Amino acid sequence: MKYKLSEIMDIIGGGTPKTSKPEYWNGDIPWLSVKDFNNDYRYVYETEKTITQAGFDNSSTKLLKRNDSIISARGTVGEMAMISYPMAFNQSCYGLRAKEGLVDEEYLYYLIKHNVVVLKKNTHGSVFDTITRDTFDDIEVELPSLVEQEIVASILQDLDDKIEVNNEINNNLAA
């Protein structure tokens, strides 16, 4: 069945606590920016910066859950990762949460990654390319059944896991 990308996921905006308020920073909440994406790995395992509960409460940032996807929406458009544990994130990204019962979380990651070129072609902005919420309305995808999604995602995960192991071996050999 065909769906607009915006129909199969919740699109979550991020935010940044005021940097002029030191009490908002260096807390217990991981705060994700594009710098933290590691293209060699599917998941983000750590963030450069953290925020406090006060920083979280006094900004527009949201908390992503394990297995949510995240995509860079400004500047370096289309970088992707999955969230390995709950973390907040900045406004240069969108969190993408699979609609339960409609799309598998892992499948959504691969579906969006597969469509990054199309997303980039549909960016807006005069100075910087930007993915907006409307960008996700403009793209239609065919969704197989949940069972088929899980099978496809499992195969792709296995391949990604092997690539990650090979990258680690290569990094150890180079060291």
Give the positions of each predicted feature.
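Short, positively charged
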Residues: 104-135, 139
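Sequence-specific dsDNA recognition surfaces
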Residues: 6-22, 35-66
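Short, surface-exposed loop/turn microsegments at beta-strand edges and helix-strand junctions
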Residues: 21-29, 43-51, 61-65, 79-91, ...
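Non-catalytic DNA-recognition/assembly elements of restriction-modification systems
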Residues: 1-15, 31, 138-175
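A short glycine-rich beta-alpha junction/loop motif
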Residues: 73, 87-94, 125-153
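Short glycine-enriched loops at secondary-structure junctions
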Residues: 37-38, 75-77, 124-125
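A generic "binding-loop/recognition-motif" signal
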Residues: 57, 76, 92, 115
